[in-house]
Amino acid sequence: MSRTVLTDITLATLIGFACLFPGCKNNDNDSDTDGTTRPPEPESLNCQIQKSFPHDTSSFTEGLLIYKGGLYESTGDPDYIGRSRLLKIDLNSGKIEKQLNLDRKYFGEGLTILRDTIYQLTYKERTAFVYTLDFKKIKEVPFTTDNGEGWGLTTDGTYLIADDGSSNLYYYEPSTFKLVKKLPVTDAGALGYNLNELEYIDGYIYANQWQLSYILKIDPSNGVVVAKIDLTDIWNRVKQKDPKAEVVNGIAYDPDSKKIYVTGKNWPELFEVQFSK
């Protein structure tokens, strides 16, 4: 037996013997070399289609929600030719029940409803629109984010919660859009990124990731991503049906039926889905 083999065996024996004593720890995946514990990876969840509904392929979806049984959508307009809209839609048929067109200088973005009042963000115009449920404009309110952009919008029942495509969530006082706090989102210890359309579901914030097929489930108490939902199979199905369909974007939750819906920009379908392990 060579000297090298003997040395290896002796070293292995000594290491094994030393680990019988307190203070000897394995350097596993939960710890870095400096002994600090790494944050856990988010749980991976699947997304199963329960039902499919028609969706207007001209809708560049930026905001999606269900309020008192009604489906509402905010659309953007990359060409700024007057296609940014606020819509109320019949879920089963996909037909528009009510429509408001934004001035073509605005790019429609995130959408939420709080206490019968509709709030709609704009992309780079730093303006939020406030409406009644029948789409009568109440006022325009300036708002601010770190990069000056508005992307997703939701509410926890007290505050309006927005993002700007970065890793940050912004909490606003609803009547004034005064910034209350900023919450950084972290994914396995690293800053999250590309946060887009938002939805608040049973105490968690769900966020699409722009240009990715994931939805992030975020704990609002600390900004930690606790789970990731993979929509790759749904996106592939949509692309096969319509190659012009854009990225995944749009999460809606019906608190009465407990049903979740997802769609994307210019998608031909909107899906009722279920998240599971």
Language-model segment annotations:
Residues 57-68, 104-114, 145-157, 189-201, ...:
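Beta-rich, blade/repeat-based domains predominating
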Residues 36-58, 91-97:
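A short helix->beta-strand "capping" segment at the edge of beta-propeller domains
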Residues 50-85, 99-112, 151-152, 264-268:
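Beta-strand-rich domains and repeat architectures in extracellular enzymes and scaffolds
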Residues 73-80, 119-125, 162-166, 207-211, ...:
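Conserved beta-strand positions in repeat-built beta-propeller and related beta-rich domains
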Residues 50-55, 97-104, 143-144, 182-191, ...:
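Surface-exposed loop and turn segments in beta-propeller and other repeat-based domains
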Residues 20-23:
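C-terminal motif of bacterial Sec signal peptides marking the signal peptidase cleavage site
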Residues 93-123, 127-129, 137-147:
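Blade-loop segments of beta-propeller domains
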Residues 90-94, 132-136, 173-177, 219-223, ...:
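Short loop/turn segments that connect beta-strands within beta-propeller blades
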